[in-house]
Swiss-Prot record:
It comes from Bartonella quintana (strain Toulouse). Residues 71-287 form the Radical SAM core domain. Its EC number is 2.8.1.8. It catalyses: [[Fe-S] cluster scaffold protein carrying a second [4Fe-4S](2+) cluster] + N(6)-octanoyl-L-lysyl-[protein] + 2 oxidized [2Fe-2S]-[ferredoxin] + 2 S-adenosyl-L-methionine + 4 H(+) = [[Fe-S] cluster scaffold protein] + N(6)-[(R)-dihydrolipoyl]-L-lysyl-[protein] + 4 Fe(3+) + 2 hydrogen sulfide + 2 5'-deoxyadenosine + 2 L-methionine + 2 reduced [2Fe-2S]-[ferredoxin]. It is found in: Cytoplasm. This is Lipoyl synthase. GO terms for cellular component: cytoplasm.
Length: 320
């Protein structure tokens, strides 16, 4: 059977690689997942700044439930290197396909927006760019340098892909000295083949460990979603794996199914279970844990950075 698509009148399929998958039912969200629709004046101003600079945000592309709250506080996470990803993770709402050429003017536009919004802390992330020799590492570095020039008081957090098969890429990003280096594991290793087939769990662990080896002053961070069918003991083992890589900060949030073609939600974790993970994480030695149903990597990132700084200072004081 051949499907003919009218390229003039039809929108590009956002997830062509998922079209062969059977539809799955989307469960009704429990009350603790509900969020208010964005309505504030500041939300509109943030939206206008993003559009004026022709930028992409992961807040919109990934369908983040916290976009109303964050944008109303002038918090935005910029997604560089385009809006088309070369991978097809079963949980992700970012479009998959063949990316466009890298926009060489993007670093300056991002820096201009950061300065205009007077951000204290900014998160820079990207799609996977397996098509690029360095996976986009040099572009990450250019964005960091541009922000340092135009908004020197802003602290910078990067949320990077895994740079798999990209020798030297990680070193380029670390040399640009972001304040926080985040790379998400996303899920437990037993779910990788189905949920994150283009990645490798222990490669991601090693990536985070290598950041600390290259520059111990950079905070490291990683996060997962729960509700994909993982077992509790797998989550606890993952925490241990992150601590063995000297990761400072972990986030845990509830997976929410974007469309019927995406991986279904197997279970909604209640708030008290997230609280339990947060307590366990602190005992295991993380400087900070953010664990609740609506936690996302960039949610409250600025506040979390301040907590990280304080926790590290207190840890060093005890060691003297």
């Amino acid at each position: 059977m051949v499907t003919v698509v009218d390229r003039v009148t039809s929108r590009r399929l956002r997830h062509p690689e998922k079209m062969h998958r059977p539809d799955t039912s989307i469960q009704k969200k429990p009350d603790w997942i509900r969020v208010k629709a964005p309505t504030s004046k500041i939300y509109k101003e943030t939206y206008d700044i993003v559009r004026a600079h022709k930028l992409v945000t992961v807040c919109e592309e990934a369908g983040c439930p916290n976009v109303g709250e964050c944008w109303s506080q002038r918090h935005a996470s910029f997604m560089i290197l385009g809006e088309i990803c070369t991978r097809a993770c079963a949980f992700c709402n970012v479009a998959t396909g063949i990316p466009l050429a890298v926009d060489d003017n993007e670093p300056e536009r991002v820096a201009d927006a950061v300065a205009q919004m007077e951000l204290k802390h900014v998160v820079i992330t990207s799609v996977d760019r397996d098509d690029l020799a360095d996976g986009g590492a040099q572009h990450f570095a250019k964005v960091i340098y541009a922000i340092r020039r135009k908004a020197p008081k802003t602290t910078i957090e990067v949320l990077t892909p895994d740079f798999r098969h990209k020798d030297g890429a990680l070193e380029i990003v670390v040399a640009a000295k972001p304040d926080v280096f985040n790379h998400n594991l996303e899920t437990v290793p037993s779910k990788y083949l189905k949920v994150r087939p283009g990645a490798r769990y222990f490669h991601s662990i090693r990536l985070l460990q290598r950041v600390k080896e290259l520059d111990p002053t950079i905070f490291t961070k990683s996060g997962i979603m729960v509700g994909l069918g993982e077992e509790r003991n797998e989550i606890l083992q993952l925490m241990d794996d992150l601590r063995s890589a000297d990761v400072d900060f972990m986030t845990i949030g509830q997976y929410l199914q974007p469309t019927r073609k995406h991986h279904p939600v197997i279970r909604f974790f209640p708030p008290e279970e997230f609280e339990s993970f947060a307590k366990i994480g602190k005992v295991k030695g993380f400087l900070h844990m953010a664990s609740n149903p609506l936690t996302r990597s960039s949610h409250h990132a600025g506040d979390d950075f301040a907590i990280l700084q304080k926790a590290r200072d207190e840890k060093f004081a005890l060691q003297r």
